[in-house]
């Protein structure tokens, strides 16, 4: 008789614990029902990245002194810098500069350590192509200014998503 009472008491405690867990999960569900949706209809609505976002690298050819600091600080030695030495002036002249964004890890070391600030990170994040060789940007493609989401009237920009800031 005593073991039956213990079993019944244990069963009652388990039932109360299960009801408490169900109540807690129901409260979490109700809390999430009051939140705004975070899904964005991507091609028509775009999120404005934060100021610290690391997007495509912008390059200014005229400022570069071909010091190759960007190549030395890059963890994967990615930027390809071609230069020639002008013996009369004892100075390097930049011939070409390219970055393969298919390999780039967007760490930002090249931008941070550049002594002339000829490199900068943009807010451009749409780099998708059908051919991976199109991701190899030369100095002309790198110097192209990024297209701003805010200026496009056909796209609705979202900046109110707090988790991306």
Curated annotation (Swiss-Prot):
Single annotated GO MF: quinone binding
Classification via PROSITE patterns: 4FE4S_FER_1, 4FE4S_FER_2
Binding site for [4Fe-4S] cluster 1: 64, 67, 70, 114
SUPFAM superfamilies from the UniProt entry: 4Fe-4S ferredoxins
Cofactor binding note: Binds 2 [4Fe-4S] clusters per subunit.
Cofactor entry: [4Fe-4S] cluster
Transmembrane spans: none
4Fe-4S ferredoxin-type domain location: 55-84, 95-124
InterPro entries, A to Z: 4Fe4S_Fe-S-bd (IPR017896), 4Fe4S_Fe_S_CS (IPR017900), NADH_quinone_OxRdtase_chainI (IPR010226), NDHI (IPR004497)
Cellular compartments annotated: Plastid, Chloroplast thylakoid membrane
Family: Belongs to the complex I 23 kDa subunit family.
PANTHER family for this protein: NAD(P)H-QUINONE OXIDOREDUCTASE SUBUNIT I, CHLOROPLASTIC
Subunit structure: NDH is composed of at least 16 different subunits, 5 of which are encoded in the nucleus.
Function summary: NDH shuttles electrons from NAD(P)H:plastoquinone, via FMN and iron-sulfur (Fe-S) centers, to quinones in the photosynthetic chain and possibly in a chloroplast respiratory chain. The immediate electron acceptor for the enzyme in this species is believed to be plastoquinone. Couples the redox reaction to proton translocation, and thus conserves the redox energy in a proton gradient.
Identification of the protein by name: NAD(P)H-quinone oxidoreductase subunit I, chloroplastic
């Amino acid at each position: 008789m005593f073991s039956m009472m213990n079993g019944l008491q244990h069963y009652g405690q388990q039932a109360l614990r299960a009801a408490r867990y169900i109540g807690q999960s129901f409260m979490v569900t109700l809390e999430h029902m009051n939140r705004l949706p975070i899904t964005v209809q991507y091609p028509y609505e775009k999120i404005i990245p934060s100021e610290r976002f690391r997007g495509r690298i912008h390059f200014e050819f005229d400022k570069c002194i071909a010091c190759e600091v960007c190549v030395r600080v890059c963890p994967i030695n990615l930027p390809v810098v071609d230069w020639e030495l002008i013996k009369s002036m004892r100075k390097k002249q930049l011939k070409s500069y390219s970055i393969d964004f298919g390999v780039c890890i967007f760490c930002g070391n090249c931008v941070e350590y550049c002594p002339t600030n000829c490199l900068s990170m943009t807010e451009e994040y749409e780099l998708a192509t059908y051919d991976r060789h199109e991701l190899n940007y030369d100095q002309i493609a790198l110097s192209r200014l990024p297209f701003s989401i805010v200026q496009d009237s056909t796209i609705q920009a979202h900046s109110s998503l707090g988790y991306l800031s």
